[in-house]
Amino acid sequence: FDGEGQITSAIGYVTSEDLPILYTLEGHGEKEMDSTIKEDIEKANMDIQSLNLLTEGSVPDDADCLFIDSPSTDISEDEKTAIIDYLENGGKAMIFSDYTTEDLPNFDAVLENYGVQREAGIVFEGDNQHYAMQMPYYLVPTINSTDASSETVSGGYYVLVPYAQGIKKMDDVRDTVTINSILTTSDQAYSKTDLNSDTLEKEDGDEAGPFDLGVSITETLDD
């Protein structure tokens, strides 16, 4: 029984006038939210609602956060514009991606608007201290202490990240955007682009690490 978590949740509830709302984007083959994550969000007293931007047209004004979990098909041009408009007006988002052979130019454009790109392929780890169960694609990255990860670091927890894509920080980023690394591989990691290969070892054409697997991005907006 997670007594401490439940108590914290109760305190947050009675001290908050309104229940924060997290909208989960749907309509593009997104993953269903993991039950453990859903429980944690609900314990933090956040209301979870689904969002179809094709029918709604924009992110609702009462959104406290937009959750985009690994779309397998691309968002539309209008959805891309709606998401960027929401973020550029102070909105918050949690965005995840999985490896896919599908082109996702509009989804990628949202990421690139904030200075990051998805690496091609899946990241493998060459340092056996940074992967689990003897599988070099079950990554155990270094957790860097940021506002988003300080509790995980201070608690001494590990994060397991299987079948991950690397995140590339772009060179040309506007001055108002700050990108901080949360999860990073060792410098022996590599991203395999040929997933039909007969070997898990690094080959010609594989991108050399280290890689970010998770980042936090903030932008300073004019008042």
Please provide the spans of the model-predicted regions:
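Short, surface-exposed patches at the edges or C-terminal ends of soluble domains, predominantly
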Residues: F1-D223
